[in-house]
Amino acid sequence: MAGRDESKKSQFSKLHHLSLVVKNMDEAIKFYESIGIGPFKDYPPLTDYVKLNVQDETGFFHLKFKIAQVGDIQIQLCQPGEGKSPYKDFLEKKGEGVYHLGFVVDDVDDSEAELRKLGLQVLSSGRREDGSGFSYMDTAQKAGVVLLVRQSPGGKQKKPK
C-alpha cells in the first residue's frame, strides 16, 4: 500500500469484536439467538476501570453490554442508559447499528500513541489497574465507523518506566 511503512505492524490487524447499539437489549438478544447468534452473556463490569476519559461517567457506567462469540469474533450489543454517551448520541442520530470495530493490541498505551502520530484523535479511553483498557479513536467521519484499540486484562503487562 502506497505511503505505508510495511515494517510497522498495523494497530488494526487483530479484529476482536463488533459493537452494535440497540434500543432494547432483550428484543435484540431474542432476535440474534433466533437466527443462531449467541448465547449472550454479561460483559465484565465497567467498574473495573480506574482511569477514565469519557464524555460522562454516569452515561459510561449505565451502558448495558451483552456479548456472544461467533468464531473468533465477539459480537457486543450495547444499550445506552441514563446519562450522556457516544452510544446514546449514535442511537439518537442514526438509529441502531454498528458503532465500532474493536481491535486487540499488545499495549493499548503504545497503540494509542502510534495512532495519535498518524493524526487520529482519541474520543474516549479507560484503563484498568494493570494498564489494560481501551481507546476509542475518532474515525467515524473518514471510516464510517469508530475504531477502537483494546488490551485485554492479563495481557502483556506494562514495562516499568
Predicted regions and their residues:
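The feature marks the first
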Residues: 2-7, 14-15, 23, 37-38
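Conserved active-site tyrosine of GNAT-family acetyltransferases
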Residues: 28-32, 115
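Conserved acetyl-CoA-binding loop of GNAT-fold acetyltransferases
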Residues: 34-40, 118-121
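Vicinal oxygen chelate
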Residues: 2-8, 15-23, 65-74, 90-107, 109-161
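Short, flexible, solvent-exposed loop/turn segments with mixed acidic/basic and small polar residues
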Residues: 5-10, 88-94
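Conserved short beta-strand elements that form part of the metal-binding/catalytic scaffold
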Residues: 38-89, 133-155
